[in-house]
Amino acid sequence: MGLMWGLFSVIIASAAQLSLGFAASHLPPMTHLWDFIAALLAFGLDARILLLGLQGYLLSVFCWYKTLHKLALSKAYALLSMSYVLVWIASMVLPGWEGTFSLKALLGVACIMSGLMLIFLPTTKQRY
């Protein structure tokens, strides 16, 4: 059950990160404070996506709380690295994100996935 909560947390946090990235690229920069506030108060699509991303992070924290009650800390924190993989893949697949493929990034993803497999491999009981 802890693994399920952990995966929910990672998926929701990844979606929230993508939402916040979209909002940040479409809203005025915060250095233009009055334009930024006006865009938020207009509550257009960009502001709604920003709010959705923030709510996603809040929901992700709840799932993470449940994860930490059910799953060993060493395994739970390893799951967080999945977010890097999901966001990288989504940035290449989703239109408008302009994520780029590189062998260096693919090698990084392979390292992350290999590490996760090592951490989550079932342990064999040693006989003494």
Curated annotation (Swiss-Prot):
It comes from the Bacteria. It is found in: Cell inner membrane. It is a multi-pass membrane protein. Residues 1-2, 54-76, 122-128 are cytoplasmic. The chain crosses the membrane at residues 3-23, 33-53, 77-97, 101-121. Its main location: membrane. Pathway: Bacterial outer membrane biogenesis; lipopolysaccharide biosynthesis. Keywords: Cell inner membrane, Cell membrane, Lipid A biosynthesis, Lipid biosynthesis, Lipid metabolism, Lipopolysaccharide biosynthesis, Membrane, Transmembrane, Transmembrane helix, Transport. GO terms for biological process: lipid A biosynthetic process; lipopolysaccharide biosynthetic process. GO terms for cellular component: plasma membrane. GO terms for molecular function: carbohydrate derivative transmembrane transporter activity. Residues 24-32, 98-100 are periplasmic. InterPro entries: Flippase_ArnF, Small_drug/metabolite_transptr. Heterodimer of ArnE and ArnF. Translocates 4-amino-4-deoxy-L-arabinose-phosphoundecaprenol (alpha-L-Ara4N-phosphoundecaprenol) from the cytoplasmic to the periplasmic side of the inner membrane. Belongs to the ArnF family. This is Probable 4-amino-4-deoxy-L-arabinose-phosphoundecaprenol flippase subunit ArnF. The gene is arnF.
